[in-house]
């Protein structure tokens, strides 16, 4: 029929399964976490190109909205601040994905699929992020810039941190505390 179809997943579906669930609003997301076998199928789909995008699924909620346990909390978790470092540490460094493939999944492919400009084209308004790939730290929700702090990854060791983001040719974010 000529219908264009794409497929995405998010870091929490690649790194967690239903065995990881806790009675805590930080674990309430839609769709919910599935089985270990489902998680393995998603990883295979990312590796073989069936899944073209890893999105953040960023759904920030206040502490109040996420404090009502698994059943009563608002749906969704934050993902923006921890998506890249999680994927780099747990998918690239072990060899499941290359860094180039991760960049395509998180940046190039979404831009292409949605027909967005940006990137690094001569004469265009640059969109890019500079990453400190050697930066190792633990995910600390208190350090998030988003209004949401609800992440099932609190305390997880990660690697790779955004130190500069340029959007439309203008600096949008700079981490002045990290040496390049």
Task: Enumerate the language-model features and the residues they cover.
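Histidine/acidic residue-rich metal-binding segments in metalloenzymes
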Residues: 1-54
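Short acidic, glycine/serine/threonine-rich loops at helix termini
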Residues: 1, 16-21, 64-68, 141-143
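A generic local structural motif
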Residues: 38-42, 116-118, 151
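Short, glycine/acidic-enriched loop or turn micro-motifs at the edges of active sites
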Residues: 11, 60, 135
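C-terminal cap of metal-dependent C-N hydrolases
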Residues: 72, 122-177
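A short acidic, glycine-rich active-site loop
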Residues: 28-38, 74-78, 151-158
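His/Asp/Glu-enriched, well-ordered alpha-helical/loop segment
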Residues: 26-27, 47-48, 53-54, 59-131
